Regions:
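Hydrophobic structural segments
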Residues: 1-89
């Protein structure tokens, strides 16, 4: 079985969760349009890089998780690898 893979070369903005998720959605839609079964994004795509002190804020990490869950709900028909921070367990 062959799988077509899209590698997203994106430039996310640090701290702009909504904007970065919207950018990811555009890449995902384009990858689906081109018949890809998987799209891979860069490290910390969702929160931007380098997030530095933002990672010390519990609220920011919670917002990242909510944004990631919304993005996952909106994604159908393609596998997505996307970088996002997570709170320690």
């Amino acid at each position: 079985m062959k799988v077509r893979i899209a590698l997203a070369q994106a430039n996310p903005t640090v701290g702009d969760l909504e904007g970065n998720a919207a950018l990811a959605r555009r890449f995902i839609a384009e990858a689906k349009r081109r018949g890809c079964g998987l799209v891979a994004f860069p490290e910390m795509m969702l929160c931007g890089y380098p997030p530095e002190d933002l990672l010390l804020k519990k609220r920011f990490l919670e917002d990242c998780e909510r944004s990631l869950r919304r993005l996952a709900r909106d994604t159908r028909g393609i596998a997505v690898l996307i970088g996002a921070p997570a709170a320690p367990a």
